[in-house]
UniProtKB/Swiss-Prot annotation:
This is Actin filament-associated protein 1-like 1. Keywords: Cell junction, Cell projection, Coiled coil, Cytoplasm, Cytoskeleton, Phosphoprotein, Repeat. Residues 165-185, 350-362, 710-734 have a biased composition (Polar residues). Gene3D superfamilies: Pleckstrin-homology domain (PH domain)/Phosphotyrosine-binding domain (PTB) (2.30.29.30). One of its GO terms (cellular component) is stress fiber. The modification Phosphoserine is found at S87, S93, S97, S103, S153, S329, S343, S747. The lineage of its organism: Eukaryota, Metazoa, Chordata, Craniata, Vertebrata.
Length: 768
């Protein structure tokens, strides 16, 4: 085989081998040898202009001393003499001689350059100049002198901080530390911009330690750099930023083993803000939902585009078997909001104390912090409540095997299983949200760092004499405040509307307040969310009241034996015996003696109070429904007009052109008439619904009942004629949800249906 052809095959094979070695951990000597081979390959086959990221210019005379670049090649011997004996698969033959031989091509190449000079220390006047990179080519990869470098560090360029162990050379006229044998090959560079040198002189340099360096932090990473991260109050701090395994990790120092911030990129939104007169830096802003969780500053637009490219590759969805895009990590959502917004790695605030006490000190300012809590990772989302329940059981088993638990601990665990008076809440601490396990006990709210550590609590609030007020701005619709003497004691946030309603009901009972969840004023929530909060709050409020009345066990429905119902007036007793199915909305009752005669009145029942909040809620709902129906009505009217116009044109065509096509035109006219009739029926149904909604809207705006609690004059007269003596028995009957629903008046739609249909039919008769 021809030697030139062998060289042509050898160069790509060596290039592939070097690319594979870039991903391996190499020692110092092996790394230097690899870089020497890479330099030889570059001299044989130069890289394209776009991939050349550095250039060294040696200004020293050849006779004044050896160049460090030249001295690196002296130890490298390329065995090219035995290339003829190489087999086709690239393995050397057994008879190959281990002695290196010089090829004629190498001899001719060696004759063009001066012979190598002996290794001597460089003269004092020797220096090398490095041409700086182009604009935007900022260093991004960091390597230590122990030889562990991240992937593709040769192409992208990185820098190393020198230490005192290297010999000194004169760089640009000043004594500086050199890199000895790795200076020329490490694609490092020196910046000669005066402003950058002054800025570097003011700021401490980040340097990897020699042996104990955490180089595993940047191993197998997609991209990493020391970037400026925006802190809470606008300051900037330089931190090591790494993208690894679909996550963005921030380390305060290169010596840290654990990241200061961990951010899942597949659930984040990234916005690039270029540098301009308003923004002094190129910024990447990471947000989760409506919360901005991280801001990074980059040195150039090219660097920002490179980071954005890596982020897009990381967060790109996976294509499933059926061609559908599947997200890389599951994000579990409930109907209205997220089921639980837990976070395992959150941004630590400056202080771990809650900053509140019984004297009424405030827990934090009203302004929401800029960095919200991060979302929990995919593993915790998949576990959910089942893993928490399993963890609780395992904790109980382990604690029981180690030592016998106290009666108080057993009572605590049993109360967690039976009574829903505990759960996770976000607490505002020093303008930062922290997640705490909150527990209600003996009119006191306890805060724990975790649900497994119930022996100690971070802080507690005595709830007697306090008030609760929902709302903490539009960004936190599920937040509520605990007030004492009109001063904020704590600001808490629930995970969803049901959880917020449950806590409001429990807190109102523990505070001893007579205010119900329906009477509270809710802001920053829509009608559906408000209904969910009020419903959950009412249920938990009545549930907590029944538990406070010494019920042996909580029940939603309980059966009571037949009991005689007595009226307040002893002269008119009733002998009716009723089997009562009391719901959680009924009055409080004691179960000490189940055969006791209970006195129940319909007037004393806990009927639904149609208050101001409920009226406003119904008014908003009916207003939205009215607008929707009017839009549908206009749409149907437009379609009817178009159909009638088309039918009119077809009839004119039939009159003008009687002939063979008239039959087809008549069939088209019949089809259009059928469509017109169907649209007309839809319009009549919409008219019926619209009239009913308008009447309900008027009643809700006037503050009247919209749920049938009071009837019209016509219905009242009918009820009085049918039941002339219904006053006395109704006052003595017990409350039953089914009977109350049956006694309600018929809906407004049925009372107005005949009249509207009659008018619609009259209108149709007039049209025809």
């Amino acid at each position: 085989m021809d030697r030139s052809r062998v060289l042509e095959q050898l160069i790509p094979e060596l290039t592939g081998l070097l690319s594979l070695l870039d991903h391996e951990y190499l020692s110092d000597s092996t790394l230097e040898k690899k870089m020497a081979v890479a330099s030889l390959l570059q001299s044989l086959q130069p890289l394209p202009a776009k991939e050349v990221s550095f250039l060294y210019v040696n200004t020293a005379d050849l006779h004044s001393g050896p160049s460090f670049v030249e001295s690196l090649f002296e130890e490298f011997d390329c065995d090219l003499g035995d290339l003829r004996d190489m087999s086709d698969d690239g393995e050397p033959s057994k008879g190959a001689s281990p002695e290196p031989t010089k090829s004629p091509s190498l001899r001719s190449a060696a004759a063009d350059v001066p012979p190598p000079l002996p290794n001597k220390p460089p003269p004092e006047d020797y220096y090398e100049e490095a041409l700086p990179l182009g604009p935007g080519k900022s260093p991004e990869y960091i390597s230590s002198h122990n030889g562990c470098s991240p992937a593709q560090s040769i192409v992208d360029g990185y820098y190393e901080d020198a230490d005192n162990s290297y010999p000194t050379t004169r760089m640009n006229g000043e004594l500086k530390n050199s890199y000895n044998d790795s200076d020329a090959m490490s694609s490092s560079y020196e910046s000669y911009d005066e402003e950058e040198e002054e800025e570097k002189g003011r700021q401490p340099k980040h340097q990897w330690p020699s042996e104990e360096a955490s180089m595993h932090l940047v191993r197998d990473c997609r991209i990493c750099a020391f970037l400026l991260r925006k802190k809470r109050f606008g300051q900037w701090a330089k931190q090591l930023t790494v993208i690894k395994e679909e996550q963005l990790l921030c380390y305060k120092s290169s010596k840290d083993r654990q990241p200061h911030l961990r951010l899942a990129l597949d659930v984040c939104t990234v916005i690039y803000v270029p540098k301009d007169s308003r923004h002094k830096r190129h910024e990447l802003r990471f947000s989760q939902g409506a919360t901005e969780v991280l801001v990074l500053a980059l040195q150039s637009r090219e660097q920002a585009e490179e980071w954005l490219k890596v982020i897009r590759e990381v967060s790109r969805p996976i294509v499933g078997a059926e061609g559908l895009e599947v997200p890389r990590s599951p994000v579990i959502l409930c109907k209205a909001d997220q089921d639980k917004r837990l976070s395992q790695e959150k941004q630590n605030s400056d202080s771990d104390s809650l900053g509140m006490n019984d004297s009424g000190s405030t827990l934090g300012r009203r302004e929401a912090c800029e960095h919200g809590k991060g979302k929990k990772n995919s593993l915790a989302e998949l576990k959910g409540s089942m893993s928490r329940a399993a963890g609780r059981k395992i904790t109980r088993i382990i604690s029981f095997s180690k030592k016998k638990a106290l009666s108080e601990d057993l009572q605590t665990f049993s109360s967690e299983d039976e009574v829903p008076c505990c759960g996770y809440l976000n607490v505002l601490v020093n303008q930062g949200w922290k997640e705490r396990w909150c527990r209600l006990r003996c009119n006191t709210l306890y805060f724990h760092k975790d649900r497994t550590d119930l022996h100690t609590h971070v802080n507690s609030i005595a709830l007697r004499g306090c008030e609760v007020a929902p709302g903490f701005g539009p960004r936190h619709p599920f937040a509520f405040r605990i007030l004492r003497n009109r001063q904020e004691v704590a600001i808490l946030e629930a995970s969803c509307s049901e959880d917020m309603g449950r806590w409001l009901g429990l807190l109102l009972v523990e505070m001893g307040s007579k205010v119900t969840p329906e009477a509270l004023h809710y802001d920053y929530v829509d009608v559906e969310t408000l209904t969910s909060i009020v419903s959950a709050g009412r249920n938990s409020f009545l549930y907590a009241q029944s538990c406070q009345d010494q019920w042996p066990e909580p029940r939603i429905y309980d059966e009571v034996p037949y009991e005689k119902v007595q009226d307040e007036e002893p002269q008119r007793p009733t002998g009716a015996q009723v089997k009562r199915h009391a719901s959680s909305c009924s009055e409080k009752s004691h179960r000490a003696d189940p055969q006791v005669k209970v006195k129940r009145h319909a007037s004393s029942a806990n009927q639904y109070k149609y208050g101001k909040n409920r009226a406003e809620e119904d008014a908003r709902r009916y207003l939205v429904e009215k607008e929707r129906l009017e839009k549908e009505k206009e749409t149907i009217r437009t379609e009817l007009t178009a159909l009638r116009q088309e039918k009119k044109e077809l009839k004119e065509a039939i009159r003008n052109n009687p002939g063979a096509k008239s039959k087809a035109l008549e069939e088209a006219v019949a089809t259009l008439e059928a469509q017109c009739r169907a649209k007309e029926e839809q319009r009549i149904d919409l008219e019926l619904k619209l009239v009913a909604v308008k009447e309900r809207l008027q009643q809700s705006l006037a503050g009247g009942p919209a749920l049938g609690l009071s009837v019209s004059n016509k219905n009242k007269s009918q009820d009085t004629t049918n039941k002339p003596q219904s006053n006395a028995p109704e006052q003595s009957l017990p409350v039953n949800c089914v009977s109350e629903l049956r006694k309600r008046s018929p809906s407004i739609v049925t009372s107005n249906q005949g009249r509207v249909l009659q008018k619609a039919k009259e209108w149709e008769m007039k049209k025809t």
